């Protein structure tokens, strides 16, 4: 295989928000891939891609390009978009997505799997960093330390969903919400003390909020702090700031977190062990997009071998993520 020019994997991107833009840039770093087109629900003429020469199409015209795209990256939201788009696109393409509503993954998997099996395509779902990379590390932790406890901490980072929830409060102009892990809780876990931690003991939510002139700040703060599913179960800090300060100091989309497994071995369980995987990301969408691209390579290869149906990170051999041959991997990384 050495010296032979391989055909490039032809990638399509559905959705051109932060994740779609991250995928477009990520393709530049993967020499075995090329971007065929971006698909949007907006007016295609209103979008100016970062890459010269890349065409933008209406999402409705995707079905006409089934023979021109090897893998479609679905860079849409998990709440309302992916539950519809996942099955729809799996009926036509190999797909990859970062579906991240944890408690609905099995239901989503089943709906995508049915369509991918009908079309004989591969659909890799939920393969960002959590679910995704963290999921793999939780699995490794459980099988290596069967008697133990798994902990996941997120942050410090911007939560897009929580920021959106604040923006929906009457009188709010704009907002950013940071999820912050509680350091003392992480230290207890790292010591192998296996603490039972409540939601409130693991994370703090810090909000930077811009409000309309004359808005009732007390009411807004109360509405944020008591919002079910988002803030009611957490210690929440609310800061009211100007729009200028929000743009100047809070325009990035950083994130990160820790996946930790603690356990014991030995005749009397006297030996403590800790497995820790952590991420510190300047750009959550850029990093997530790069994980989707690695799994796009795997989806393409598996489908070439005659595999089809929905898959998760648990089902994909790690070697399929890499552009290197099996021999190169053994020589360079094993």
Curated annotation (Swiss-Prot):
Give an example GO biological process.
Answer: lysine biosynthetic process via diaminopimelate
Annotated membrane-spanning segments are: none
Which species is this record about?
Answer: Acetivibrio thermocellus (strain ATCC 27405 / DSM 1237 / JCM 9322 / NBRC 103400 / NCIMB 10682 / NRRL B-4536 / VPI 7372) (Clostridium thermocellum)
Catalytic activity annotation: meso-2,6-diaminopimelate + NADP(+) + H2O = (S)-2-amino-6-oxoheptanedioate + NH4(+) + NADPH + H(+)
Protein name per the record? Meso-diaminopimelate D-dehydrogenase
Coiled coil start-end: none
This protein's UniProt keywords = Amino-acid biosynthesis, Diaminopimelate biosynthesis, Lysine biosynthesis, NADP, Oxidoreductase
Report the induction information.
Constitutively expressed.
| Binding locations of NADP(+) | 16-19, 40-42, 75-78, 98-100, 127-131
Q: List, in alphabetical order, the Gene Ontology terms for molecular function in this entry.
A: diaminopimelate dehydrogenase activity
Q: What does this protein do?
A: Probably plays a role in lysine biosynthesis. Can use NAD(+) only very poorly since the activity observed in the presence of NAD(+) is about 0.3% of that with NADP(+).
- UniProt family annotation: Belongs to the diaminopimelate dehydrogenase family.
Q: What is its EC number?
A: 1.4.1.16
NCBIfam families this protein is in? Answer: DAP-DH (TIGR01921)
Q: How does activity depend on temperature?
A: Optimum temperature is 65 degrees Celsius.
On the tree of life, the source organism's domain of life is: Bacteria
């Amino acid at each position: 295989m050495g010296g032979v020019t391989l055909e490039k994997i032809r990638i399509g991107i559905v959705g051109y928000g932060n994740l779609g833009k991250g995928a477009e840039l990520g393709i530049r770093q993967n020499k075995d891939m090329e971007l065929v087109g971006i698909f949007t629900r907006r007016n295609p003429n209103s979008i100016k891609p970062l890459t010269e020469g890349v065409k933008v199409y209406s999402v409705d015209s995707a079905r006409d390009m089934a023979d021109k795209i090897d893998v479609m990256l679905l860079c849409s939201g998990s709440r309302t978009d992916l539950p519809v788009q996942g099955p729809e696109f799996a009926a036509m393409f190999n797909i990859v997505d970062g579906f991240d509503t944890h408690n609905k993954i099995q239901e989503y998997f089943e709906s995508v799997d049915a369509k991918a099996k009908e079309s004989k395509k591969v659909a890799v779902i939920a393969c960002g960093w959590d679910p995704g990379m963290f999921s793999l590390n939780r699995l490794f932790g459980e099988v290596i330390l069967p008697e133990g406890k798994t902990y996941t901490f997120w942050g410090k980072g911007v939560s897009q969903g929580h920021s959106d929830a604040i923006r929906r409060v009457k009188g709010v102009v704009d907002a950013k919400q940071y999820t912050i892990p509680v350091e003392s809780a992480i230290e207890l876990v790292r010591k192998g003390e296996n603490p039972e931690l409540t939601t409130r003991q693991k994370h703090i939510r810090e909000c930077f909020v811009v409000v309309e002139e004359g808005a009732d700040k007390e009411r807004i703060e109360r509405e944020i702090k008591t919002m079910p599913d988002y803030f009611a179960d957490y210690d929440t800090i609310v800061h009211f700031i100007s729009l200028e300060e929000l743009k100047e100091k809070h325009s990035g989309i950083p994130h990160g977190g820790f996946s930790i497994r603690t356990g014991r071995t030995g005749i009397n369980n006297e030996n403590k062990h800790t497995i820790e995987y952590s991420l510190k990301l300047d750009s959550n969408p850029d990093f997530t997009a790069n994980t989707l691209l690695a799994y796009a390579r795997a989806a393409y290869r598996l489908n070439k071998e005659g595999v089809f149906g929905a898959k998760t990170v648990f089902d994909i051999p790690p070697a399929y993520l890499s552009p290197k041959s099996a021999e190169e991997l053994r020589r360079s990384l094993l």
